[in-house]
Amino acid sequence: FKKFNLGKAIQAGKDAAQAISLSDADIAAMSKEYMEWMDKHNPLTKPDSEYGKRLERLTGNIKEVDGMKVNFGVYEVVDVNAFACGDGSVRICAGLMDVMTDEEVMAVIGHEIGHVIHTDSKDAMKNAYFRSAVKNAAGAASSQVAKLTDSELGAMAEALAGAQYSQKQEYEADAYGVEFCVKNNIDPYGMYKSLNKLLELSNGAPASSYMQRMFSSHPDTAKRVARAKELADKYKQ
């Protein structure tokens, strides 16, 4: 993908979405590079580990979601976290699997995939690329396709870790999580239960944590949890 002219972008005062003209192919290439970097810098559990076996039991039959090929993995880290990327990669941290039931884990997976399907992750990737370029003073004008450097990928990982979605985006991802559970014969209340659990864990959690990012707008938190329950109720009627 092409490097953007950072000087002009800053001078124009444009936000990330406006400053960067990235095609779907660019995003796909960045996503692939990003996931290669993440998998290199985080310990992936082995398929025959307890986490690996559990993940296979939950997701082994899921090869594609809404036309997107998916692959799953577990990072053997204590963080209560999960994310999905534009290349179809879904990663769950062992810390999240430790505190959640199977249906709650599946709901979170569905929620994160929902952000990709709804292109929320694409926008977050654009913003992260802009922020990483600023941090690394990258962005010299170039018409040549270039790979991200290791430092740029590290900065992008840092930027994505702090990314927050709008309440509307979170509502839609929650709804997708409920539907994902239903399609895979999982309790539709998994989303409601996982949100409740994350809400409990968010008390006192660092502002940069997954729990705090999931509930970035505190006044609407109760509504969001209630809405997830209402969505599940419809499938139980």
Segments from the language model and where they lie:
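A Zn2+-metalloprotease active-site environment signal
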Residues: F1-Q237
